[in-house]
């Protein structure tokens, strides 16, 4: 937001369509580059994706029991709770699916960097990787 406010156009602070995946992934990528993205955090990101997927098809109890195969009780509970948050009846299938963007975004930003993408351009504001080619026409 702050970097976006420094740009000529407000859209850089309000956000381009679908910017959030890149923004969250870029934050995780920066943690990774600084050596702060531990295997435990990555496992949590993956667990959130799994919990989201399971929640779309199952009840709270079924999701929790499935996650116990991969996570300790407290972690399985927290992952299930996050995936089912906001639902009025957690016994039914459904999920708050925003949490999948952290892992997906991280992997996309990492791939972008590994393929020679200009990481510095992602600091410009709330943009997605797919918007980087458009910057030459805007800035």
Q: Where do the model's predicted regions map?
A:
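Conserved alpha-helical "signature site"
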Residues: 39-139
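Post-HExxH zinc-binding segment in Zn-dependent metallohydrolases
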Residues: 2-51, 105
